[in-house]
């Protein structure tokens, strides 16, 4: 059973965004990363795409969802500050979960750069995919 835990693509810096941080969008680099993630993640047999409801996470996986014809589902368990509530989501074959750095750390104890991902087999990290 293979799943992918993805940290959202580049979205600039929190302190540079004057509005509600949940609405912070991807920057130019992040938009490029999100487009490149399509080919990077296509080989993993993606059947379901889940995302934190934060704009930067949704935007990270929108190109993947569109390219694969898979519905993008927002899930609050992947939102910043939700802790390890999303652990059960990673126990589904073919799921991509897009989230934030603090959630990645809570779930697998790792630290990913923006746009990078961990590939998991039966809930255990087996590989890191560097950010495009």
Predicted regions and their residues:
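Active-site-proximal alpha-helix that buttresses catalytic centers in soluble enzyme cores
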Residues: 2-84, 110-118, 132
